[in-house]
């Protein structure tokens, strides 16, 4: 999977909300995503409200972390990865969302294996 300045899942959505996962201090190792794909993932959350207290689910639902106005963009990779594991096997609205999900999981796994920090920017 290509994680070198990958814009594939934002092309055609310029001007709409963009979510960028990037290695802290390395703008070239990044994936740029249309927020609609993230919304699609989050709109298919399995479980109960108690399951929304971690990772991307928490930040998306409560407008914390990258979704806040405070620019708190460095994420806990394990927190995000483990939260997103709950979505494995979910059928999403958009066909491309599964590819986005797989790409985000791959990106987080690679960052963890390489002891890198990840920041998420919602713009």
Listing of model-derived features with the role each one plays in the protein:
Residues 1-106, 110-114, 123:
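Acidic (Asp/Glu-rich) sequence patches and key acidic residues
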